Amino acid sequence: MRRRRRRDGFYPAPDFRDREAEDMAGVFDIDLDQPEDAGSEDELEEGGQLNESMDHGGVGPYELGMEHCEKFEISETSVNRGPEKIRPECFELLRVLGKGGYGKVFQVRKVTGANTGKIFAMKVLKKAMIVRNAKDTAHTKAERNILEEVKHPFIVDLIYAFQTGGKLYLILEYLSGGELFMQLEREGIFMEDTACFYLAEISMALGHLHQKGIIYRDLKPENIMLNHQGHVKLTDFGLCKESIHDGTVTHTFCGTIEYMAPEILMRSGHNRAVDWWSLGALMYDMLTGAPPFTGENRKKTIDKILKCKLNLPPYLTQEARDLLKKLLKRNAASRLGAGPGDAGEVQAHPFFRHINWEELLARKVEPPFKPLLQSEEDVSQFDSKFTRQTPVDSPDDSTLSESANQVFLGFTYVAPSVLESVKEKFSFEPKIRSPRRFIGSPRTPVSPVKFSPGDFWGRGASASTANPQTPVEYPMETSGIEQMDVTTSGEASAPLPIRQPNSGPYKKQAFPMISKRPEHLRMNL
């Protein structure tokens, strides 16, 4: 699935990574690391002054959710007492959704225990490839921990995480609507009401992440999936930055060039305001057919982002033009959303004046595009280049050293929704309530990531309680995490309901056009 700039890698690998890898479907970026080929600081800054001063002021304070969550004591014997022990054999491979340098993503059906018969997406990562690079290990850690920590209607759900001797497995909800990238490629541009719907849902997801102290940093059409109803789901959390609160800044160079905020390119420190720049770049892309600043190569693209004037087509409404100008401000401190109100500032803009935010959060607003699906296993919204391949999870014959396996202690996870059904079946007794704790950032801008074997995965087993020589036998573990009440939406994470045949044909919401995107950003349909 590729469009204007589909990166090599599963669901887009960010532009700063240049690995030769296959395309993968947007919720699961496999290529975790690529060389930082952004050019020198001199290259970034040469050629004149910026149009606006690069003032990277602090972020205003905002409240962090530290809800108390009920915990259950989970052990090897309690979770796997009767029906199952989560492992690859619990899942039947159905289709290949994508693949990259570090593994594959499959559509699978659970064939044992809880959730039997339900359809999921299974992301498989090779340990031997990941442990070669501290940054890749940190990216994997961040993605797994954030997916456990965050539960929101517009963010992909992690159902299980487990491991074998040589592989890591993430079981995620299957998002049969495919990537927003695909819809943009088919349509060319979106009408403003269509773009407004998607941007509104995305803003709610970003706001929730920011409340948790998480900067997303990789917002682009390939990382925005659609569920069976057409609602947004943010995916691919490998580039997220954790524990960014109250004016804290980070310096890591990461993201996709065309959607990257100037302060990231300048490496002068950035905060959550970078996500609002990316939202503005995405909005511009939706309404015009291409990101706001593109060049013949990376150097020229960066130069344009830092110095060129924003050109707005005359057909845009005044509200759209005003929002774009306020989101795409090079001065991060004056950017809309950079203040204490964060997402609230963006959502209060007149462009969103027709949005009922409560109904939107409850997913009661009808999406502009609803995928035509024949069954819950439908893969029509994914690239046939992969879906027609025979799904095979290669034999797990690799062996890591004892010290290398220490990194993956505590990777195992079972979603609270699954544990609740297990709890009822086996009469678990509730333990004391304990506040969720936030773990530190997995990356540092100066020195390589250093691992603490006992607590690398944050919520995992310690070295003193697990046998590092037998990672396949790690017990199921979980911690209390926030539960979103989405019962009003009438929607379950998986399996995805089959669309009713009388729901009508798909109605186009935008005018198709010849793509203005650079060749490397296009998708050949």
UniProtKB/Swiss-Prot annotation:
Region described as Autoinhibitory domain: spans on this chain: 424-525
EC number: 2.7.11.1
PTM (free text): Phosphorylation at Thr-412 is regulated by mTORC1. The phosphorylation at this site is maintained by an agonist-dependent autophosphorylation mechanism. Activated by phosphorylation at Thr-252 by PDPK1. Dephosphorylation by PPP1CC at Thr-412 in mitochondrion.
Broad class of where this protein is predominantly found: cytoplasm
Residues annotated with N6-acetyllysine modification: 516
One GO-annotated biological process of the protein: peptidyl-serine phosphorylation
UniProt motif (TOS motif) ranges: 28-32
Positions contributing to ATP binding: 97-105, 123
Positions where Phosphoserine occurs in the chain: 394, 434, 441, 447, 452
Entries under CDD domains matching the protein: STKc_p70S6K
GO CC term, one of those recorded: mitochondrial outer membrane
Ranges of biased composition (kind: Polar residues): 381-399
Stretches for region Disordered: 1-54, 380-399, 486-509
A Pfam family per the record: Pkinase_C
The record's note on its domains: The autoinhibitory domain is believed to block phosphorylation within the AGC-kinase C-terminal domain and the activation loop. The TOS (TOR signaling) motif is essential for activation by mTORC1.
Family stated for the protein in its record: Belongs to the protein kinase superfamily. AGC Ser/Thr protein kinase family. S6 kinase subfamily.
UniProt protein name: Ribosomal protein S6 kinase beta-1
Species name: Oryctolagus cuniculus
